[in-house]
Amino acid sequence: MTKGILGRKVGMTQVFTENGELIPVTVIEAAQNVVLQKKTVETDGYEAVQIGFEDKRAKLSNKPEQGHVAKADTTPKRFIREFRDVNLDEYEIGAEVKVDVFAEGDIIDATGVSKGKGFQGVIKRHGQSRGPMAHGSRYHRRPGSMGPVAPNRVFKNKLLPGRMGGEQITIQNLEIVKVDVEKNVLLVKGNVPGAKKALVQIKTATKAK
């Protein structure tokens, strides 16, 4: 069954194993996760658990939001996400979800919004090769051929310069190196999408090896 939690990316560091192996890890702080609603097939057509993350001031939330969180006897939340394929019996409305739902060695998927890079060319954005830099070449970092003459247009999906980054990215099959219950922190092996302080969604891997 799926387990999930929301957190903020603190940054990256490194830890050492007992045999001296260095492991780069991403630190994710996952405090203030509260179960807001349990959805069932009878009432909603599917099963899921709705989790709210990070308190926000009541004046910043509207009446429907305040009424929704009042059923869970908690404060308005800044982020609300759903996790499907869960065991609903393990969750109680209004209960806090802590990082100990995961254990060291668990394989997870991490979802976040990638860093925005602004307007970029095809070499940086799509990894294309540049042209010759000498011998009279006047073609260096341009997109290249736009296609044949006959259609009198550029085909859809042609790789061109444009806005790069700022997209939702999921990195699969990452390993949890350490779970710190006291500080509500997860250490995940490798990098996780997003800038520092960005929202990160952690859930059980769908394609675990």
Curated annotation (Swiss-Prot):
Keyword check for Iron-sulfur, yes or no. no
Annotated TM spans: none
Asked if Ribosomal protein is a keyword of the record, the answer is yes
Annotated HAMAP family: Ribosomal_uL3_B
Name of the protein this chain belongs to: Large ribosomal subunit protein uL3
GO molecular function annotation:
rRNA binding; structural constituent of ribosome
Q: Which UniProt keywords apply?
A: Ribonucleoprotein, Ribosomal protein, RNA-binding, rRNA-binding
The record ties this protein, via PROSITE patterns, to: RIBOSOMAL_L3
Entry similarity comment: Belongs to the universal ribosomal protein uL3 family.
Residues of the region (Disordered) are 126-148
